[in-house]
Amino acid sequence: MKVLNLKERWSSKARSYDDLFILAVLGALCGLLSGLLMAFFYAVIYLPSRYWIGEDFDSFESLPVEWRVGLVLAGSVVLAIIFSLLPSRLHKVGVPYVVERLNYHNGNLPIWNAVVQFFSAAIGLISGLSIGKEGPAVHLGATLGGYLAEKAKLPQYGVETLLACGVAGAISAVFQTPLAGVLFAFEVIFLEYRQQYVLPVLLSSVIATLISHNLIGPLDVFSIESISSVSLSLDLFYACFALVAFIVFLSALFLHTQKSLWRLSGLSIWARFLFVALVTSVLAIYLPEVLGSGYLSLSRLLSGDLIVYSLFLLIIVKTVLTAFTIGLGIPGGMIGPTFIIGGLAGIQVALIFDNNEADMVLFALLGMAAMMAACFQAPLTALVAIIEMTHSSSVIVPALFVVVLACLLMRVFFHQESVFVERLSYMGMSSTVSPFQRYLRHHTVKPVAEDVLLLPQYVPIEQVKDLASSMIDYVVFKIGNEHHLVRRVAILDALSKLDQGPQLWLAAEGDSVKMDFSLALESTFVPVIDEPSSLEQMLGWFQKHGLPEVLVTVTASSFSLVSRNRLDQFLLKSDQ
């Protein structure tokens, strides 16, 4: 018995190592494809922009007024036409949709929604709307991971792993921060850290970063060479307190503006999108720096090439406009713009405290980290992103300070979760699954499945006698197109009646005498289904159909028997 237990444990470990290797290979493939897809997405967005803007593709303020207004109006009208023609099921895009599909549809992300996300986000970004590319990148990466998992027929934990690989790969390719990409997948999408997913997700993230770096080039938002060391003085922390207060104000403004606009989702697409076009067009005339993602404005402010008459006004308007644009349903991201808003806020605080150029860069980084952490409740992602961007740990203490304070204040005083969690909550959905659901999702049907023998309806008597030495308890045979289940013991009991004389179920075929199972036995019809990806799907099937047993297809010619009773016993045992 001990030998059998050791063998069982060893084979279980071997299977887990095989699963890890398969997931690592698929994760690497997911990272490769995510990197290529993000490079293509980048080209689709920025090549047309460079045609009419020039090398500085995010510099919409350099365009004539009529061009700025024309681009905004044209982009909004094209988006309104597209979304008014598409069925409503294809309108769902972005990070909240990814979390919804993960929690309510086992991570199954339709391809066509990703296609809509790709082109609609590209149109919005090219036209200068105040949105980002990072949210759409998450949707595209997650869809790619889910597609690979579906084609590989992975169980549910494998689907979730590749989903995380796709998200991490996409974020890593966009920001070129591989570790921050991994943490983003766990903190923002899964809302928990999952140790068993780490290796494949890390591999995907690193490969996507390498692909992005080689195809796009370095994506340095601004020069950080001036940061060599940080003096942890009291003046620094006074300034950090001021920065946190400003960031929390901006985060609350950003979130509450969106919340107030979610109530307008009942308006027509034309009304909402043209409203965005009108407001953005007016701002494009008087404050063109608010157009686009804002990366170039931040970079120019730090280098001294751009001077705005009121940086504070720019920050407030950019915050409200981004929330306004996203809140009314424009299919873009909010991660990039909030990152830039935080950077601008950091520069504003640095100017108030009359800091030098090096401190301006430092506070821009701190503002970016604090804003990301406060809006998306992703403290580790924000912290690690800053460390990876600076290639230095010298900023870690002030970054920790502002990130933790910003997150705490948003949670404790404003009672606000991540903007994505708040969006799902507004829609009446949960952003997490219960521990019981998670347990079911992380197990396949193998622990509750029993082997069965698949035999024809007519079986030679000699073969029936051989069943006495079999260790399998159940036999399945077909009557027409239906599968019927019978216990092996019942077959042997029927066979023993031959000692009493000829039986009605005997059938002669040439020189062979066979048993007709349909006449000899009282069998139970049992349906056949494809193997579910998790015990959650299996339990859902039993609850829906109310049947006690089902055959699960293992291969084209073999089945396993799963019973509701055995499933309940497994769940009760797991609670002990």
Whereabouts are the PLM-identified features?
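Alpha-helical transmembrane segments and immediately membrane-proximal extracytoplasmic
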Residues: M1-H442, K446-V475, G480-N481, R487-A507, ...
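Short, conserved catalytic or adaptor-binding loops enriched in Gly and charged residues
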Residues: V445-P447, F517-E522
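Amphipathic coiled-coil signal-relay and dimerization helices
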Residues: H483-A490, S558-R564
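Acidic/proline- and glycine-rich, intrinsically disordered low-complexity segments
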Residues: L504-F517
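Cytosolic regulatory modules rich in charged/polar residues
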Residues: E509, L519, S523-Q576
